[in-house]
Amino acid sequence: MSQIDENIRYGGAANETDGEDAQRKAQEREAKKAEVRKRLEEAGQKKQKKGFLTPERKKKLRKLLMNKAAEDLKTQQLRKEQERVKVLAERTVALPNVDSIDDHAKLEAIYNDLFSRLCNLEEEKYDINHITTETETTINQLNIEVNDLRGKFVKPSLKKVSKYDNKFKKMAEAKKEDGSKNLRNNLKTVKKESVFTQIANKKKSDKPEWSKKKEEKKEESAPEPVIEPVEEEETAASEGEEEEEEADEE
């Protein structure tokens, strides 16, 4: 009795069930941990597959590059403007106050100085233009040679011409060739008849009713053809030949 009481008091059979529940819970906990670990590994693999440049990072990088390009363009334009102002300041000369000068010799000297300076600038401009045209022609020739070696054909720069200009030119040439040419000759001739002529032609072609009735009566009263024997046909043919001979003799 004492052992049974102790088992009942300290849990006995209940201890076995509690141990099974604890074991099952531990297994469930381990399974949940393994599932969470697996999910974390999959998420890490997905992040690794995406790489460093995610769409958000690409967007930010594109924005930064655009801002940098805009800043560089502004600085380049400012630098060019400063260089232009500097070159103009070096090349241009401050004009003297001509209104306050009364001496003719001084005015003539100023005029000669400015004129000689202008001539020099025009010569430099002509030389620069000549050099640029030569370089452009050489570049074009080299491009043509390179394309020929590669086997490519460069489209020539075609001039835009209005189609109406060509039409007017052709018309002018045709007028020069045939000055007295009548355009009505090319038109199609259509024969027109008046109403009166149509009625007259209709009357000529139509037969009167009394003639139509006569023809119908003749057709009705006409005898039916009779088939004659062969001997009668031969006698008729001989009689016809004799009549023809008599007619020839007469």
Swiss-Prot record:
One of its GO terms (molecular function) is troponin C binding. Residues 21-45, 206-221 have a biased composition (Basic and acidic residues). The keyword Iron-sulfur does not apply. One of its GO terms (biological process) is backward locomotion. Strongly expressed in body wall muscle during embryogenesis, reduces during the larval stages to adult. In late-stage larvae and adults, expression is evident in the proximal gonad of both hermaphrodites and males. Residues 1-59, 194-250 are annotated as: Disordered. Disruption phenotype: Worms exhibit abnormal locomotion. SUPFAM superfamilies: Troponin coil-coiled subunits. GO terms for cellular component: muscle thin filament tropomyosin; troponin complex. Residues 229-250 have a biased composition (Acidic residues). It holds the Pfam family Troponin. The keyword Iron-sulfur does not apply. Keywords: Actin-binding, Muscle protein. Belongs to the troponin I family. PANTHER family: TROPONIN I, TROPONIN I 1. Troponin I is the inhibitory subunit of troponin, the thin filament regulatory complex which confers calcium-sensitivity to muscle actomyosin ATPase activity. This is Troponin I 1. The lineage of its organism: Eukaryota, Metazoa, Ecdysozoa, Nematoda, Chromadorea. The gene is tni-1.
